[in-house]
């Protein structure tokens, strides 16, 4: 089970282990671990466009959750994300 919270402008991920203990760590740690796993699976193969791959993996869930949180209000969502509303509209297409 994962849960995201904002604490002092740092996104954290809460996880529940097998003993039902909740632990929190910064989202960046989860991203770092996911990248370590990704590199381990590559077995030395070259990668192209890793930056774009990571952004695409993060951007869509971000857009989905912000739009859900703002109940579809694109102006409010754009303000929350710190981007222009037109830019948000393009990303939502």
Curated annotation (Swiss-Prot):
Alphabetized SUPFAM superfamilies for the sequence: Homeodomain-like
Protein origin, superkingdom: Bacteria
UniProt-recorded Gene Ontology molecular function terms: sequence-specific DNA binding
DNA-binding region: 74-93
Keyword tags: Activator, DNA-binding, Transcription, Transcription regulation
GO biological process: regulation of DNA-templated transcription
Keyword field contains Transferase: no
Function of the molecule: Activates ribosomal RNA transcription. Plays a direct role in upstream activation of rRNA promoters.
Family recorded in the similarity comment: Belongs to the transcriptional regulatory Fis family.
Self-association and partners: Homodimer.
NCBIfam families: PRK00430.1
Name of the protein described by the UniProt record: DNA-binding protein Fis
Species this chain originates from: Klebsiella pneumoniae
Gene designation: fis
């Amino acid at each position: 089970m994962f849960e995201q919270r904002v604490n002092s402008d740092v996104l954290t991920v809460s996880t529940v282990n097998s003993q039902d203990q909740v632990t929190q760590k910064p989202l960046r740690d989860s991203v770092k671990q996911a990248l370590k796993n990704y590199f381990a699976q590559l077995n030395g193969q070259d990668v192209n466009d890793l930056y774009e791959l990571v952004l695409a993996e993060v951007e869509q869930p971000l857009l989905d959750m912000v739009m859900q949180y703002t109940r579809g209000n694109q102006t409010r969502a754009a303000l929350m994300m710190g981007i222009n509303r037109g830019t948000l509209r393009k990303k939502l297409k």
